[in-house]
């Protein structure tokens, strides 16, 4: 934080505190983690699009999305057009999200039927995803490994690749130029299915 006056190149104490909360992810008042992880380090090049906006007034898509999602899709009973994200109650509202989560989410870590059928899956997530935290995917993978008996058992059917510098869905190219169009998970998946060669990498063009 700035020890002198606040400037565009230095964070105030309040700004630093906000950033720390972004990093830690949502918690209840007693410190219970409500969702795995927060906004990852390395996602800063994409904040203008999703979180902060830029000097030209572009970006800042997450607040707009969260507002309408909360009004009309998040809860069993829609709170309506007057609701704002500032009204979200971290003590009571997470439980209220569970009903619609059953409709929207496809994140069960129980892959027993998939594995028994001989299925193969390649998953990937960008480490620089500022809006769907990659820590959730890591958490899902760890739970899937536990249910499979071990990570080695899970690897017979599932390969997960965490991509440094990759934005949410690879929409914007990062500083290293990687975007979703640069990744090719299909070729190693097809090779895995046809030849039984377990993928150890995904090539980025």
Predicted regions and their residues:
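C-terminal His-loop and adjacent cap/lid subdomain of alpha/beta-hydrolase
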Residues: 1-205
